[in-house]
From Swiss-Prot:
Organism: Bos taurus
A Pfam family recorded for this sequence: DnaJ_C
Lipidation sites (S-farnesyl cysteine): C394
Protein name: DnaJ homolog subfamily A member 1
Binding site for Zn(2+) 1: C134, C137, C193, C196
Topology class, membrane: Lipid-anchor
Record's function text: Co-chaperone for HSPA8/Hsc70. Plays a role in protein transport into mitochondria via its role as co-chaperone. Functions as co-chaperone for HSPA1B and negatively regulates the translocation of BAX from the cytosol to mitochondria in response to cellular stress, thereby protecting cells against apoptosis. Stimulates ATP hydrolysis, but not the folding of unfolded proteins mediated by HSPA1A (in vitro). Promotes apoptosis in response to cellular stress mediated by exposure to anisomycin or UV.
Keyword Phosphoprotein in annotation: yes
Record text on subunit structure and interactions: Identified in a complex with HSPA1B and BAX. Interacts with RNF207.
Residue ranges of CXXCXGXG motif repeats: 134-141, 150-157, 177-184, 193-200
Gene expressing this chain: DNAJA1
Binding locations of Zn(2+) 2: C150, C153, C177, C180
């Protein structure tokens, strides 16, 4: 039992969620609420990052489950939180802060794919907008020699203000220079490039061909190196495509295996059957259970080499795993005569010799709501004992 569920609620998972479920939840939410896509959701993005940072670490998660957020803040597992952007970059393969200072920003896109796409391979065209260096001014922002050091911040891009907070006590506040917007330089409006308006970069449409190889997995990343946003003086970042697999109506993927449930009738479980299965590459395979091979309810069997192709070894495949659900006939489906005949065909049942010490009881259908109602009525009864309800009482003389 966990002390509180706030972090689990933020990620939209249950307290018993696996690491894979946590990763999938963080991936979807981080991409949805990233400041580049939702500038007004900075606090939400921070909450998502903090929740994942704690729950993805086994020691921090154990501490949180026992003591809640307060236990994390008190520093029992390292204390404090990392930068939300650093967590995002490390998760999506973008490196940390130092790497970002040398390179332009990576751009992350989520691409929805089907299980068929991952089985057969596919090619998708993705249209996106990216920053490229303005070719009119060659990334200068204006005429040659027009760029000058910002006199307001002296080229640092930051302003420092001293604020007195009490007698003999001052506070130093650092903020982005409003004159140059943190660039450390400025260009006179008359000298600015007409194409980029002094920003040095322009937006450009880019069409990417995304090749999805056979056997790729949900959450796998496809990286286009150097295709991210460009900035003067920096190496371009990457475009990272994250695959997001939709649920399939029949199959569930488990590593390299495919899992499915199959309903069969009692006669099929006892006497054998043949069942067709439509595969993800539009073939039809037929599975056979021969007469005399009893299939029990809940039995799990597999077909070799009919699972998912193995990534980069597409001629090798995992297993198709099938769990059988045996459907029994309804009450009264046989007449007494036929039931007697069926009994003779089946293995002999064991008879019970009744004694006087035995009691006959009736077997009835189970009602899962019965215990809930009994529990509710019991609470109401106890409440009446401790807090009698108002009403008419007998008078005593």
């Amino acid at each position: 039992m966990v002390k509180e569920t706030t972090y689990y609620d933020v990620l939209g998972v249950k307290p018993n969620a696996t690491q894979e479920e946590l990763k999938k939840a963080y991936r979807k939410l981080a991409l949805k609420y990233h400041p580049d896509k939702n500038p007004n959701e900075g606090e939400k993005f921070k909450q998502i990052s903090q929740a994942y940072e704690v729950l993805s670490d086994a020691k921090k998660r154990e501490l949180y489950d026992k003591g809640g957020e307060q236990a994390i803040k008190e520093g029992g597992a390292g204390g404090g939180f990392g930068s939300p952007m650093d967590i995002f970059d490390m998760f999506f393969g973008g490196g940390g802060r130092m790497q970002r200072e040398r390179r332009g920003k990576n751009v992350v896109h989520q691409l929805t794919v089907t299980l068929e796409d991952l089985y057969n391979g596919a090619t998708r065209k993705l249209a996106l907008q990216k920053n490229v260096i303005c070719d009119k001014c060659e990334g200068r922002g204006g005429k040659k020699g027009a760029v000058e050091c910002c006199p307001n911040c002296r080229g640092t891009g930051m302003q420092i203000r001293i604020h007195q907070i009490g007698p003999g006590m001052v506070q130093q506040i650092q903020s982005v220079c409003m004159e140059c917007q943190g660039h450390g330089e400025r260009i006179s409006p008359k000298d600015r490039c007409k194409s980029c308006n002094g920003r040095k970069i322009v937006r450009e449409k880019k069409i990417l061909e995304v090749h999805i190889d056979k056997g790729m997995k949900d959450g796998q990343k496809i990286t286009f190196h150097g295709e991210g946003d460009q900035e003067p003086g920096l190496e371009p970042g990457d475009i990272i495509i994250v695959l997001d697999q939709k649920d399939h109506a029949v199959f569930t993927r488990r590593g390299e295996d495919l899992f499915m449930c199959m309903d069969i009738q009692l006669v099929e479980a006892l006497c054998g059957f043949q069942k067709p299965i439509s595969t993800l590459d539009n073939r039809t395979i037929v599975i056979t259970s021969h007469p005399g091979q009893i299939v029990k309810h809940g039995d799990i069997k597999c077909v070799l080499n009919e699972g998912m192709p193995i990534y980069r070894r597409p001629y090798e495949k995992g297993r198709l795993i099938i769990e059988f659900k045996v459907n029994f006939p309804e009450n009264g489906f046989l007449s007494p005569d036929k039931l007697s005949l069926l009994e003779k065909l089946l293995p002999e049942r064991k008879e019970v010799e009744e004694t006087d010490e035995m009691d006959q009881v009736e077997l009835v259908d189970f009602d899962p709501n019965q215990e809930r109602r009994r529990h509710y009525n019991g609470e109401a009864y106890e409440d009446d004992e401790h807090h009698p309800r108002g009403g008419v009482q007998c008078q005593t003389s």
